[in-house]
Amino acid sequence: MRKALAAAALLLLSLSLQAGNLAFSSMIGDNMVLQQNTKVRIWGTASPRASVTVNASWSKKPPVTAKADAEGHWEVMLETYGASFTPQTVVASSGGEKVTASNVLIGEVWLCSGQSNMEMTLGGGMGTPVEGSLDEIALSAQYKGVRHVTIKKARATEPQYDAEGEWQVCNPATSPRFSAVGYFFATRLSKALDVPVGIINASWGGSVIEAWMGEELLKDCPDVDLANASSKEVNDMYKPMIMYNAMFRPASKYAVAGILWFQGESNISISNEVYAERLTAMAAEWRRDIGRGDIPFLIVELQPYDYYDGQYGLQDEHGPLVREQQFIASKSIPNAGLVGTNDLAYEHERTQIHASQKRQIGERLCYQALSLAYGYPNLPAFNPCFKSAKLEDGKVIVSFDNARSGFMGLSEEIRGFEIAGGGGHFQPAHAEVRMSFMGTTVVLSTPAVPEPVEVRYCFKDFEVGNLKGANGLPIIPFRAKVAEAEEESN
């Protein structure tokens, strides 16, 4: 009798261990948004070598079947149709097991990544509020189609199969934990397109760009020690490749329409001179992993901030160096955009790296997404940026791209422009907007510099200019040599 009971107990234990093996990836579940009009990956785990069948409620085709590998990993590709606010389900079954993802919407999905200014939630933090967040949070339930998932912070020295995260609907209880930039982008895009929008937020405050790059890219960087990835002596924020492996690689399996990137503060003193090269390489790597070489890649310019205030022990002009590198990268990366933020810092935020104006960033990202990804190329979504500079009767004539309709009128002196002579000593310049049939230019002069050879605009850690394009967007800060600028632009 005892032997029979023991055998029965062992059998029950064996069955219990085998039960419950079927599961979706953490990123696949209730409330998710799937990218419309494409094939999306659904993946998870099951018993090794088990057959898994996946059925989507919107599909008119037969269920899709896959076989788990030796580790129990499985994945299938499902075809999605046009966007809809009608809730759907995805069901996976294997043997007697079944798992269901409910309240699934089909629409547009974007990946947000970077460091703390992307991670910063709509609810804000201690001493770091988000301007206008109370109204947004209180009224957030109106955005029925907006969903958000935060990828849990994790570190790994090898690419991971899965990452932790749970999709959330948008309401006053959940929206305070959404990425603020991601929230404003998603809600505006959802209204503009009248489709559901999902945001995948994979961010880590303080992280350097090297943490988001793979070993394949970093092994050729002489200043990067890959051994630091597993070192206990190095802060996680500065460890190479660990976030790429643990957070991005799993997220890259999820079909998305584009990428939003807000990072660079931590590279102010680390590899700032090669930041454009690394960002360009990273964008190509991410696109390769996602499986779309032309996916829109939108970069947020660093907001004005006094990096030299003693907190970092740096000299002035480290901030503008990275901004310049961001601009270079935006021109090197195909189908990319740079959202200018020079006007989005108040004077009292001079030493606050988490500036409060996040709504405008999300909205400007939305405008560029509409232009690059959704068939509205004539939308004036891009910031005026430097094109050329020439010398004319002792004055510097500066031309701009993305300023076809000129600049907004001002009742005050234009500020932010400086010119320098051969000695390299910059002086504030008087600026006048000149309009002609050839286009709109800015004419710069000062008696202090009779023979200017260099020009710059807001090329400091914290300097907020006041000249904006007719579209209301600020000029991208720049520096250039007057004699060579026109040749370089050709």
Task: Enumerate the language-model features and the residues they cover.
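Hydrophobic h-region of N-terminal signal peptides that target proteins for export
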Residues: 10-18
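Primarily membrane-embedded glycan-assembly and transfer machineries that use lipid-linked glycans
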Residues: 6-9, 259
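Cell-envelope and extracellular/periplasmic
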Residues: 20-490
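Positively charged n-region of N-terminal signal peptides that target proteins for export
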Residues: 1-4
